[in-house]
Every structure is written in structure tokens, then in C-alpha cells.
């Protein structure tokens, strides 16, 4: 049985740990609020550019653009978004498990796929398994700006146009609520659903100088926006997952402290009882 000193030492160290996890929980809650606002504020822009691109797609169905053309899939790229740090529960493991499983099920060899990694955890995961990484981005701040990911997004789109890969899938954690995040996979390139526009016709446009030249500018911006929007979504999910993980850690620490305190009190009571018994026994022996 552990000594009173050992139990008291464990109680002290657990209390210090709970203070740290509580502080991290509060910090993550504040970051979540900002990240959620950033993700929501980007939605109107996404809706509008999707509406405009869909309108162009409807009125110019015969326009040929490299980002719209499907071709024989010889190689697939997966843009996987994770965090740079851990302590976020199943945030990273869920998205990595989903991406890795998809690669194993769909492809016969590593020559058929490659990874574009955003986040240190994902990059290290794929490097450890010797999965080819054709581009990576780490060290992003808690409040991501488009400037930080612009080069990677444009490089990714250009690699698709140049034929480095034939499909691009986006894998990330979609923010549902503070307690729920869903692993989401979307086929980003080629852009194949522009003509549908979700079945909603909102306005008619006149395009100058031509639909083709408008698409030449809009399509890369649209694809870049999809990547940036997914990253904002993932950031909100990361902070939510870390907040929940730290809350669970704090709650578990409190339960452990209660259990240790009970053990400490019992051990102390047993020690006192033992001392009283020894005193009484000694007194009886002297009579």
C-alpha cells in the first residue's frame, strides 16, 4: 500500500496538472470563438463565388478549361489537413485514419497516390509510412489568413493542370458544433459540378470580355477558396476538439484527486488506529 507521503505527492502533482489542463481549456474556448467566427464570415464569399461560377458553367457548357476536364485517373493526390500540435483528442487520428484507409483501399501501389500535407502531425504520419509527399505546409497560426496558404493552393492547382496528378481529394475535419466534428472527404479537382449550382438560379449575368476569360480567372480563385474554407473549418474543429479534450482531462483529474483524497484519509485513519492500538497494547502490557 502506498505511503501517506506518496499519496499526498500524487494529489499535489495531479492538482498542478488539472490547473494546466483547465487553463488550456479556457484558451481553446477563446480561440474556438474566433475561429468559428472566421469560418462563418467566409461563408457569404464562398456562396457568392460559387453562384457566379455556377452561372458561368450553365451558360457556357462548351467551354473547355483544364480544371473542368476529367481524364483517366493514373494518380490521385490527397490534401490532408491536420494540426501542428497534439492534445486534441481524436482530431488528428480520425482524419489520418480516414485518409490512410482510403489510400489503402483504392490503390495498388504508392505510385498511384501522393499527399499534400497541411499540418505537422499529418506530415510526420505520412513520412513515417514512406508515403510520397509532394507539398507540405506547417507552422500556421491559430487565425489563418489566405496569404499563408495562397502559395500552396496555387501550386496545388498548377500541379493538377500540369498533369502531376489527375484527381485531388480534400480530407479534413468539418466543424459541426463545439462537441461534434466530422471527418469529411471531397473531390476538389476536377471541378465537375459547376453547371448544377445546387439547382438554384439566382441571377443572370453578362460576362465581359467573355465567359472563357472570366472562367480563367474565377476557377483558380474558386478552388483556392475551397481549400481556404476547409482550412478555416478545420481550425475551428481543432480548437473545439482541444477544448473538449482538456475539459475531459480536467474532469478526470478531479475524479483522481477525489479518489486519492479518499485513499489518503483512509490510510491516515488506519495509521492513527494502528498507533492507538499500539499505545493501548503497550499500556496493557505494563499493568
From Swiss-Prot:
Belongs to the ATPase gamma chain family. Produces ATP from ADP in the presence of a proton gradient across the membrane. The gamma chain is believed to be important in regulating ATPase activity and the flow of protons through the CF(0) complex. Keywords: ATP synthesis, Cell membrane, CF(1), Hydrogen ion transport, Ion transport, Membrane, Transport. PROSITE patterns: ATPASE_GAMMA (PS00153). It is a peripheral membrane protein. It is found in: Cell membrane; Membrane raft. F-type ATPases have 2 components, CF(1) - the catalytic core - and CF(0) - the membrane proton channel. CF(1) has five subunits: alpha(3), beta(3), gamma(1), delta(1), epsilon(1). CF(0) has three main subunits: a, b and c. The F(1)F(0) complex interacts with SpoIIIJ and YqjG; YqgA is found in the same complex. Interacts with FloT. One of its GO terms (cellular component) is membrane raft. GO terms for molecular function: ATP binding; proton-transporting ATP synthase activity, rotational mechanism. CDD domains: F1-ATPase_gamma. InterPro entries: ATP_synth_F1_ATPase_gsu, ATP_synth_F1_gsu, ATP_synth_F1_gsu_CS. This is ATP synthase gamma chain. HAMAP family: ATP_synth_gamma_bact. It holds the Pfam family ATP-synt. Its main location: membrane. It comes from Bacillus subtilis (strain 168). GO terms for biological process: proton motive force-driven ATP synthesis; proton motive force-driven plasma membrane ATP synthesis. It comes from the Bacteria.
